[in-house]
Each structure stands twice: as structure tokens, then as C-alpha cells.
A protein has these predicted regions:
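Short beta-strand and adjoining strand-loop segment in the mid-core
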Residues: 27-54, 101
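FAD/FMN-dependent oxidoreductases across multiple families
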Residues: 47-83, 130
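Rossmann-like NAD(P)(H) cofactor-binding subdomain of soluble oxidoreductases
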Residues: 1-28
Length: 195
């Protein structure tokens, strides 16, 4: 949404992917998961003509006419996993194990509450299983927020949790655990900014 005014008449294509990679200690990129890529436009336009040749380079790909829902589901998922793994210094899979399972479930419930208030009930209903599936399938992975925090870099906390708390709905419900996680990561980000 922020980029749209900057591009004039050009068509803005946005997307989400479940593919992932990380840098090795030597700076090489290592594929940590091959997944699905979804693209679309915010105005629900049909697929552009350039898509056919582009599709050949991306194995599991889909054009989505409702990309907003795809992006919201991804933000909701990341709002649960990323701050917890970053602040606790754990892998994705550890979130579904004691002692972190209880707080993970609390955060899921708070994000679901935000989604329901914004009338995104289907995304809210799917969130618990989506979190479990991602934590299982990427059990050994480190979230990007954890990598950024441990590397002394600024995180995407504002674009993920900050956006959910501030922009999803005009009157958000109480989210004490999620808000506390947001504040803790923000504080670390501020320290990075000052350094």
C-alpha cells in the first residue's frame, strides 16, 4: 500500500512465498525450504501477460485474485512465530513444545481475536493449524526475526506485529501478550538504531 503512490501507472504485483533461504557462515545462500509462491495485485487484477515465462522459473506458483487475504494470513502467522522465536532464541519447532507451547497458544488466540475483529474469520480459524504445520515443517529453522535480532540488525516487527496492532482494525481488542512481545522486540530495535 505504501509503494502504490510511488509507482504511478505501473502495475504493482505483491506476493508471498513459503520458500526460504539463509546465509551460511561463509556468506553462501542455502535453501532452507522450497515452498509455494503466490502473487497478485491489490486491486484483484487478472494475471499479467508476462506471467507465463516467469512461471517457468518458479516451480510451485499461483496467481491469486485475493492476494490481500494471502498476505494477511502470512502476517498473522509471522506475528505468532517471529517475536517468540526471536526473544526466546529458539527454533520454530520449539514453539509447539513445553514450556513454550502455552505462550504460543496465547499469542495465537490474541492474533485470532484481532483477525475476528477485522472480520477475517476464515484466516482466524485456520491460524492454529497453520502455526502448528509451519512449526512442524520448519522445526529446525530460525525465524528471520531471530536471525536479525541475534545479528544486531533491525527487525520487521513494525511491518508484522506493529501493522496488526495499529492498522488491521480501528478498535483492536486487548492483546496483552502480543503487545508485550511487540514492545520487547521494539526495544531491541531501538538499541540497534542507537548503536
Amino acid at each position: 500500500e505504501a509503494a502504490a503512490p510511488l509507482i504511478g501507472e505501473a502495475q504493482l504485483v505483491v506476493g508471498s512465498t513459503t520458500s526460504g533461504c539463509r546465509r551460511s557462515g561463509k556468506g553462501e545462500l542455502i535453501v532452507s525450504g522450497e515452498g509455494r509462491t503466490q502473487l497478485g495485485t491489490l486491486d484483484a487484477s487478472p494475471a499479467p501477460t508476462w506471467l507465463s515465462p516467469w512461471r517457468q522459473g518458479v516451480p510451485d506458483f499461483e496467481w491469486e485474485t485475493d492476494i490481500r487475504s494471502v498476505l494477511l494470513a502470512k502476517v498473522a502467522l509471522n506475528a505468532v512465530i517471529n517475536p517468540l522465536t526471536a526473544l526466546r532464541g529458539v527454533t520454530n519447532g520449539e514453539l509447539m513444545q513445553p514450556p513454550l507451547r502455552a505462550i504460543t497458544e496465547e499469542v495465537i488466540e490474541e492474533v485470532q481475536s484481532l483477525l475476528r475483529t477485522a472480520d477475517a474469520r476464515e484466516i482466524a480459524s485456520a491460524l492454529p493449524e497453520q502455526v502448528r504445520a509451519v512449526c512442524d515443517s520448519t522445526a529446525a529453522n530460525h525465524s528471520s526475526m531471530r536471525v536479525d535480532l541475534e545479528g544486531g540488525k533491525r527487525t520487521e516487527i513494525d511491518a508484522i506485529v506493529g501493522w496488526l496492532l495499529s492498522n488491521l482494525t480501528p478498535q483492536p481488542p486487548s492483546t496483552p501478550v502480543l503487545s508485550e512481545l511487540y514492545g520487547a522486540v521494539k526495544e531491541r530495535d531501538l538499541r540497534v538504531s542507537r548503536a
